[in-house]
A protein has these predicted regions:
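Core nucleic-acid recognition elements
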Residues: 1-484
Length: 484
């Protein structure tokens, strides 16, 4: 393994902000430094020429100061057994530059923590702040990092023994996996698998829970409503669709795809020609595609990745509209409870506390907008508008009741273009192969649909944390290039 130090990983502002957060957890910390560090897995020792080429590839970024350079060392790397999107891109660049002996390049961050009392190590809570424990790990010895290049066997799927233990086995899996299945759904699954005379796998239950969650199926909004013994004519979704029913002129697609489409006009597209691999102008009818959705639960648990993946999911839905569309501009919006800004608290802000498993309104508004904007920027779509609102009020009649947005509303949306020939999906013949386009399938963010369907606080904090996806704008950009 070859090790090469890189540039500073944090801007001075970000480094100072991180230091303040660390000091709030451990008052023994006096300073912080951070720089990228590169690990290279090569088949043999590099020649002097190839070593110089590799060093030039790994010289990048602004010339920021490193911060503290002497002190307690912590190294943060992608979890062993995973390959980061940065790694795949850097390795490709090395291959193109003729470094055929380089098998893989991976990047981490070397943190230097200065301490008042050198006999004390930093507290675990402070170290946890330096990495995302879902996608990264922290080590104290650089020699341990060589394990990142070890290929691990995928963990096998397990089965839930309903043939022996019946519904009880499903109830245990429901709790442990955070599936949010109700009794009726568990009875349905039990009946179906007993008919098949086999046990379900954990993967099957996880997939069913997501596809059948309130987040995906909107069972409440599609349900029949009976109020005071009178069955209502329309569901909540029917009422939402009334706007389209009463004013559908120039609407080409609505409530049947990942995003809606309204009619546009003829214009020139600047697109690649698949025949000669060159860009050119193509005159076609260009329609407008639009989408808005929410990402409330993930943003409440972990604001930055919650808001970032909210934008990422909305971009994915736009791209998957019809037979492929092109996202162009985005929006983000936030509704939260009182902010309680330190040294600037307002007279109307009365504290009622908050659940431990969710972020505060201030944390959401510090990290959430940055997550949404950063993802849009990294994908290559400007985030051009949004809104921000705070509201929290005690009920004047019910003394123990308060209203507000402890679980925030986090809105993501956007607009883009789609060609006339791509507005509607074609029928898929039986037996067709399906390509799943994107990153590796890891247990990160799986369970978000079912977790968001639970009442806040009924899940445990680890399941809540695991249910938040992690952003990967670069990989989504690659997928978008395949689509358009």
């Amino acid at each position: 393994m070859i090790v090469k130090e890189g540039p500073a990983s944090h801007s001075p502002f970000k480094l100072e902000s991180l230091l303040i957060r660390l000091q709030s957890l451990d008052n023994n910390i006096t300073g912080l430094g951070a720089r990228f560090i590169h690990l290279i897995d090569a088949e043999n020792e590099l020649s002097e020429e190839h070593d110089q080429i590799l060093s030039s590839i790994l010289e990048y970024g602004p010339n920021w100061p490193f911060g503290a350079e002497e002190g307690f060392k912590i190294f943060s790397f992608p979890r062993f057994g995973t390959i980061s999107p940065w790694s795949s891109k850097a390795t490709d660049i090395a291959k193109v530059c003729g470094l055929d002996s380089v098998k893989r390049i991976e990047r981490g961050i070397a943190f230097t923590i200065q301490l008042k009392d050198l006999n004390l190590e930093p507290k675990k809570g402070a170290i946890d702040l330096l990495h995302d424990r879902m996608t990264e790990l922290a080590i104290s010895e650089l020699d341990q990092a060589s394990e990142i290049f070890v290929t691990l066997e995928p963990k096998p799927s397990s089965t839930i023994d309903i043939l022996s233990d019946g519904k009880n086995a499903l109830e245990v899996a429901n709790q442990e996996l955070g599936l949010a299945l109700n009794d009726e759904e568990m009875e349905y699954l039990l009946d179906q698998f007993l008919k098949l005379n086999r046990n379900p796998s954990d993967a099957e239950l996880m997939m069913f829970a997501q596809a059948n969650s309130e987040h995906c199926r909107h069972k409440v909004f599609n349900a029949d409503w009976v109020i005071d013994g009178i069955e209502k004519e329309k569901s909540l979704f029917d009422m939402i669709k009334d706007t389209y029913v009463s004013s559908s002129k120039n609407v080409l697609s609505a409530y049947k795809d990942n995003a809606a489409v309204i009619a546009g006009d003829k214009a020139d597209w600047f697109l690649p020609n698949l025949n000669d691999q060159e860009y050119g102008r193509f005159n076609d009818e260009i329609h407008t595609m639009m989408k808005v959705e929410t990402h409330n639960h993930p943003t409440a648990i972990s604001p930055y990745p919650g808001a970032a993946t909210g934008s990422g999911g909305e971009i994915r839905d736009e791209a998957a509209t019809g037979r492929g569309a092109m996202p162009k501009a985005g929006l983000t919006g936030f509704s939260v409870s009182h902010l309680f800004i330190p040294d600037d608290e307002q007279s109307w802000e009365e504290t009622i506390g908050k659940p431990d498993h969710i972020a505060s309104a201030l944390e959401i508004m510090i990290d959430g907008p940055i997550g949404g904007a950063a993802y849009n920027n990294e994908f290559g779509r400007p985030n051009i508008l949004g809104y921000f609102r705070t509201f929290e009020e005690k009920d004047r009649e019910e003394k123990n009741t308060s209203w507000g947005f402890h679980k925030p509303i986090m809105i993501v949306g956007g607009m883009g273009n789609i060609s006339d020939s791509s507005v509607n999906k074609n029928d898929i013949p039986a037996g067709s192969l399906i390509i799943v386009l994107g990153g590796p399938a890891m247990l990160i963010g799986l369970g978000g649909g079912s977790a968001s369907s639970l009442n806040a606080g009924t899940s445990n904090s680890e399941l809540d944390f695991a249910s938040v996806q992690r952003d990967n704008a670069e990989l989504e950009r690659r997928a978008q290039e395949v689509i358009t």
